[in-house]
Amino acid sequence: MIDDNGYRLNVGIVLCNTYGQVLWAKRYKQCSWQFPQGGINIGETPEQAMYRELFEEIGLNYCDVRILSITRCWFCYKLPTQLVRWRIKPLCLGQKQKWFLLKLLSKDTKINMKTSKVCTFDTWQWVSLWYPIRQVVFFKRHVYRKVMKEFVKLIISR
């Protein structure tokens, strides 16, 4: 779903463990790493989209996690000009994201990157909460920084 400003409505997921680490996933057959994220379909709430993406991308269900927090506002990033698909309509210029902080309740052996026909990720690891800000692709860094600042107290108090 793309809004009137050309932003695709999207959810992002920060999954933390009991040690204050966050799940960091490598995109399938690529060198880039990121948090799980995905689009909101027409008729879906952000929470419904988050649970769908959680299963599609890392194989977890609602019973495997607990929602600790949701960002107060939507965060946006623009795609670099060379990544915009100019011939595809409606035109998507970037993402408008609502972020969820989830606590993993199950064992991390339940994480499964191969639950969908099309894999988003091929591997994952636990990392310190600030690591992703320095490692994510440059045009997402400002969003990651804002999200982590909003979630930091909840992550380190686990």
Curated annotation (Swiss-Prot):
The keyword Hydrolase applies. Keywords: Hydrolase. One of its GO terms (molecular function) is mRNA 5'-diphosphatase activity. Residues 6-149 form the Nudix hydrolase domain. Its cofactor is a divalent metal cation. One of its GO terms (biological process) is mRNA catabolic process. InterPro entries: Nudix_hydrolase, NUDIX_hydrolase-like_dom_sf, NUDIX_hydrolase_CS, NUDIX_hydrolase_dom, RppH. Its EC number is 3.6.1.-. A motif (Nudix box) lies at residues 38-59. The keyword DNA-binding does not apply. Disulfide bonds: none annotated. It is an enzyme of class 3 (hydrolase). One of its GO terms (cellular component) is cytoplasm. It holds the Pfam family NUDIX. Belongs to the Nudix hydrolase family. RppH subfamily. NCBIfam families: PRK00714.1-1, PRK00714.1-4, PRK00714.1-5. Accelerates the degradation of transcripts by removing pyrophosphate from the 5'-end of triphosphorylated RNA, leading to a more labile monophosphorylated state that can stimulate subsequent ribonuclease cleavage. HAMAP family: Nudix_RppH. This is RNA pyrophosphohydrolase. The lineage of its organism: Bacteria, Pseudomonadati, Pseudomonadota, Gammaproteobacteria, Enterobacterales.
